[in-house]
Amino acid sequence: MGKGSMTAHATPNEPDYPPPPGGPPPPADIGRLLLRCHDRPGIIAAVSTFLARAGANIISLDQHSTAPEGGTFLQRAIFHLPGLTAAVDELQRDFGSTVADKFGIDYRFAEAAKPKRVAIMASTEDHCLLDLLWRNRRGELEMSVVMVIANHPDLAAHVRPFGVPFIHIPATRDTRTEAEQRQLQLLSGNVDLVVLARYMQILSPGFLEAIGCPLINIHHSFLPAFTGAAPYQRARERGVKLIGATAHYVTEVLDEGPIIEQDVVRVDHTHTVDDLVRVGADVERAVLSRAVLWHCQDRVIVHHNQTIVF
């Protein structure tokens, strides 16, 4: 990962201007700086001095070191800088030459008011897809949904009222290569994030390498105990006491990417299979929407195979 190209994928300890439901976007002159490097004295001072000399006022500053000595330092700074949009490219260059080169920092600047371009991929289950579209229409998510891609046509009528293009690309085990080529034509260079909202196809390593942006997936937290078909039936037969969900970044290793968010709900012997499915869908919606929001707010930094969420 080269300097200036940090793939920050980023938890909410401060307000950071989250838009209220239906409210305005973040102020235009609010910027975010994410960085990661080998820990050593002087990093915070150097970052703060650079921003001050650029005319920026730091609103909040969160940092974490993985160890007292020899650890990795991670930081997220929120700052106000008049005329940020015109200055952000210069900030990126100057920070690289004056601070990042000295400390070996991987970093990225972002404008809070510039929403992430997001594509959602789905199959036939609608709960996660429609929840994201609904929350986004209410102004709860800092993103612009540019398209929905599905390998089945079932959800087209549900997506149209949101004014988002629905693209049906059939994908089976036999047609996966052709389907992924078409998906890449639509996605590569056009989106900042892809959300797999219960997209029930395994993406190839070649697709993940070529896509050029992070992907977030959601799955129930029975994995790996109840993989495959009918997990809720088998979970009830086993007498599970907790139902949960995990949102994570997608890697070549299935369902083992860096975890962004997890949650659980307690269940008991009175819950039927249908009850478990309903509870599971509720927690999946909540977990996925939080993970997507945190990513779009530049709160997540990936460190090895885990995340630091500020």
From Swiss-Prot:
Is the keyword Cell membrane assigned to this protein? no
Its keywords, alphabetically, are: Hydrolase, One-carbon metabolism, Purine biosynthesis
> Which PROSITE patterns does this chain map to?
ACT
Is Hydrolase one of the keywords UniProt gives this record? yes
The protein here is known as Formyltetrahydrofolate deformylase
Q: Where are the active-site residues found?
A: D255
Stretches for region Disordered: 1-30
What range(s) does the ACT domain occupy? 32-108
The UniProt similarity line reads: Belongs to the PurU family.
Composition bias, kind Pro residues: at what positions?
A: 15-28
Pfam families given in the database record: ACT (PF01842), Formyl_trans_N (PF00551)
Q: Which GO terms describe its molecular function?
A: formyltetrahydrofolate deformylase activity
Entry's EC annotation:
3.5.1.10
A biological-process GO annotation = 'de novo' IMP biosynthetic process
The organism encoding this protein is: Mycobacterium bovis (strain ATCC BAA-935 / AF2122/97)
List the catalysed reactions. (6R)-10-formyltetrahydrofolate + H2O = (6S)-5,6,7,8-tetrahydrofolate + formate + H(+)
Q: What does this protein do?
A: Catalyzes the hydrolysis of 10-formyltetrahydrofolate (formyl-FH4) to formate and tetrahydrofolate (FH4).
**To which pathway does this protein belong?**
Purine metabolism; IMP biosynthesis via de novo pathway; formate from 10-formyl-5,6,7,8-tetrahydrofolate: step 1/1
